[in-house]
Curated annotation (Swiss-Prot):
GO terms for biological process: translation. This is Small ribosomal subunit protein uS3c. Its main location: plastid. Keywords: Chloroplast, Plastid, Ribonucleoprotein, Ribosomal protein, RNA-binding, rRNA-binding. GO terms for cellular component: chloroplast; cytosolic small ribosomal subunit. It comes from Euglena gracilis. Residues 39-120 form the KH type-2 domain. One of its GO terms (molecular function) is rRNA binding. It is found in: Plastid, Chloroplast. The gene is rps3. InterPro entries: KH_dom-like_a/b, KH_dom_type_2, KH_sf_prok-type, Ribosomal_S3_C_sf, Ribosomal_uS3_bac-typ, Ribosomal_uS3_C, Ribosomal_uS3_CS. Belongs to the universal ribosomal protein uS3 family. Part of the 30S ribosomal subunit. The keyword Repressor does not apply.
Amino acid sequence: MGQKVHPLGFRLGITKSHSSFWYVERRHYASFVKEDIVIRNFMNKELLETLISLIKIERIYEFSEQRNNTIVYIHVARPERVIGRDGQGLSRIRDILIDRMNYLLGKTPRIITCKVVGVTSPNLDARLLADSVRRELEKRTPFIRAMKTVMLQAMKAGAEGIKVQVSGRLNGIEIARTEWFREGRVPLHTLRADIDYFNDIAHTIYGVLGIKVWVYKV
């Protein structure tokens, strides 16, 4: 059997970059990874309705003062919902995040800055397209219609190709199966090809459905 490689990890350093960017002493490494997990889980839950595309974390660790300066870049399709009036929404989220981290990880000198980045082409973003399929499946929309809709949106937005795969008890049938559709080209083995990928889970009354989306962008 052929083994599949994660499309994003396969292209790190070529067309993709790491979503966490920092360096720290070995004894602090585990605590920084925990902080990353807490930040991502909090943002994905708190900002669910803002259509998050990507969360990037950068750190500048000051060894002399043992202080952690963290910058969180939140890429969303609806930035106005995050920022709020006069930036109050963003400040509230940052304060809640600091309280959550102090509660779960203990109080340490940390400075967190949140910056919002708007997504210019949401219909070419694999995560946003997968989120759209998930919402439709949870509304009990037929899976073929949900898949074809996002594929049409992506191709109209200028994608070179898109592949969407859904697996599980499709339309509530007893036996689980996998269905996929592809439009255009999706060259997974070409390293210089800009492939965006995301996998998501839809919770339905029949069980869990797995969703995978590949988008080939020029």
